[in-house]
Swiss-Prot record:
This is Glucose-6-phosphate isomerase. NCBIfam families: PRK00179.1. Belongs to the GPI family. Its main location: cytoplasm. It comes from Mycolicibacterium vanbaalenii (strain DSM 7251 / JCM 13017 / BCRC 16820 / KCTC 9966 / NRRL B-24157 / PYR-1).
């Protein structure tokens, strides 16, 4: 049997402490410590992180840090950074942090100079995107490229989509990006709508160049391009309108892409950790190699903080442990991520894959069952949209939902308010600060009664407060800050995975469904009535589908 973290004295001490503290509220904690608002906060790079509105005391944090040490967090963190094979089920190193090492750094893993490999790919990406952005790279008809379409799925899509939207203000070369992921043809059709084949370039992002959804979309895109250009130009166009992010040179060549325009990455990069690799080629095409370097530098800044800061002043460690505190001791199952920036509209969706694919595991790294809940469920929408949708549940519902608020002092865009005298960004951020305040401190029946509210309405207006949140405030949404935010959450995922004893870097749970889909496709499309399926529900669904498609049921 593997080591059971819940059987350790550190876990049991936390359990006893939870019994003692769970009745305390944030009003009382702030009243007891007038300096709490600044004492439970720290600055990492451009991020000011306020964790004072959490249901924790100094003792809570000390006990959580004892748990981290009991689980061997410092040694396991060092093992990750050094290139040890901590992805045990696949016997792989986990080196997304190497993707943002500076050129003069040194890291050799399994006999390979990792830093040299990373920068060789970055240099090739930079040279390619320089040609694209300057207009030197031309399509088959001699026109310059104005749109790149990234075709990928999962980590090959969610990261680039999110970062492209977040950094839209840094698009400075007349190139825009679109993203196709879903095998539903509606996705590709919508994204190609209005595009000119002569000025469109496709990036096919698939490590193996065999991902079903990606290759299906890529083949349809190739047909659209060839048909759109017509004649000999269409037949010869693939090499000038398609590039690949892959490691399978043979299949890339078979598709018609010049392997000189293939950008690779490595087995030690998981898809959900890959936006700062060649998977970010579409981002670099839009914002340029210098801004992309700033993006990588933001990651590296937080990497170095996570690697070297004392545990008690280490932002990813503290935030990861606080997330685990709610998940395992308060029974909270979800965490809301609420960016007060419309440019971060896809950040919660990006974090869903990062966190839930990483820590959605029911066995420990040694294959034995876990003894406690794992994997926070992440969700969210930008403020203030969420305030008019689901904040009601956050404020007055029966479920505890810790929330992360992310905001910026300087806007990427600003407009005057209705009377022409104020700033819409100030209005946005007043909501940010108000929501964290009301979640924490609420409003009592006595306060509401004192305002003259009818007695029968008072219970409906009571805001219980004591709803925890983290506030992350940065000066402005820049390439570096986006990198810092991503790394902050990457390392929280690692911290929680270490405590739970799971492998946060495999994803076997996604495989069986893909295999079964391949088996079911001929059942859906075959000319003859299919054999009965193994369960009556699937059998009935398949037959109804075939009937509605005009096929023999």
């Amino acid at each position: 049997m593997g080591s059971d973290i819940t059987a350790t004295p550190a876990w049991q001490a936390l359990s006893r402490h939870h019994d003692e503290i769970r009745a305390k509220d944030l009003r009382g904690l702030f009243a007891d410590d007038p300096t709490r608002g600044t004492g439970f906060a720290l600055t990492v790079g451009d991020l000011y992180i306020d964790y004072s509105k959490h249901r924790v005391t100094r003792e809570t944090l000390d006990l959580l840090l004892d748990l981290a040490r009991t689980a061997g967090l410092p040694a396991k963190r060092d093992a990750m950074f050094s290139g040890a094979h901590i992805n045990t089920s696949e016997d792989r190193a986990v080196l997304h942090t190497a993707l943002r090492l500076p050129r003069d750094a040194s890291l050799t893993v399994d006999g390979q100079d990792v830093v040299a490999d990373v920068h060789e790919v970055l240099d090739r990406m930079g040279d390619f995107t320089d040609r694209l952005r300057s207009g030197e790279w031309r399509g088959a008809t001699g026109e310059r490229i104005t749109t790149v379409v990234n075709i990928g799925i999962g980590g090959s899509d969610l990261g680039p989509v999110m970062v492209d939207q977040a950094l839209r203000h840094y698009a400075d070369a007349g190139i825009s990006a679109r993203f196709v992921s879903n095998v539903d043809p509606a996705d590709l059709v919508a994204k190609l709508n209005g595009l000119d084949p002569a000025t469109t370039l496709f990036i096919i992002a698939s490590k193996t160049f065999s991902t079903l959804e990606t290759l299906t979309n890529a083949t349809a895109a190739r047909r659209w391009l060839v048909d759109g250009l017509g004649g000999s130009a269409g037949q010869d166009a693939v090499s000038k309108h398609f590039v690949a992010v892959s490691t399978n040179a043979k299949l890339v060549d078979d598709f018609g892409i010049d392997t000189a325009n293939m950008f690779g990455f490595w087995d030690w990069v998981g898809g959900r950790y890959s936006v700062d690799s060649a998977i970010g080629l579409s981002v670099m095409a839009v914002i340029g190699r210098e801004r992309f370097a700033e993006f990588l530098a933001g990651f590296h800044l937080v990497d170095e903080h996570f690697r070297s800061a004392p545990l008690e002043a280490n932002a990813p460690v503290l935030l990861g442990l606080i997330g685990l505190w709610y998940s395992n001791f308060f029974g909270a199952e979800t965490r809301a991520v609420l960016p007060y920036s419309n440019d971060l509209a896809r950040f919660a969706a990006y974090l869903q894959q990062l966190t839930m694919e990483s820590n959605g595991k029911s066995v420990r790294a040694d294959g034995t069952p876990v003894s406690t809940g794992t994997g926070e469920i992440f969700w969210g929408e930008p403020g203030t949209n969420g305030q008019h949708a689901f904040y009601q549940l956050l404020h007055q519902g029966t479920r505890l939902v810790p929330a992360d608020f992310i905001g910026f002092s300087e806007p990427t865009d600003d407009l005057p308010t209705a009377d022409g005298t104020g700033s819409m960004h100030d209005l946005l951020m007043s909501n940010f600060f108000a929501q964290t305040q009301v979640l924490a401190f609420g409003k009592t029946a006595e306060e509401i009664t004192g305002e003259g509210t009818p007695p029968n309405v008072v219970p409906h207006k009571v805001m219980p407060g004591n709803r925890p949140s983290t506030s992350i405030l940065a000066t402005k949404l820049t390439p570096s800050v986006v990198g810092q935010l991503i790394a902050l959450y990457e390392h929280q995922v690692f911290v929680e995975g270490v405590i739970w004893g799971i492998d946060s870097f495999d994803q076997w749970g996604v495989e069986l469904g893909k295999t079964q889909a391949k088996a079911l496709l001929p059942v859906l499309t075959g000319a003859d009535s299919p054999a009965a399926q193994s369960d009556s529900s699937t059998d009935a669904l398949v037959r109804r589908y075939r009937t509605e498609r005009g096929r023999t049921a």
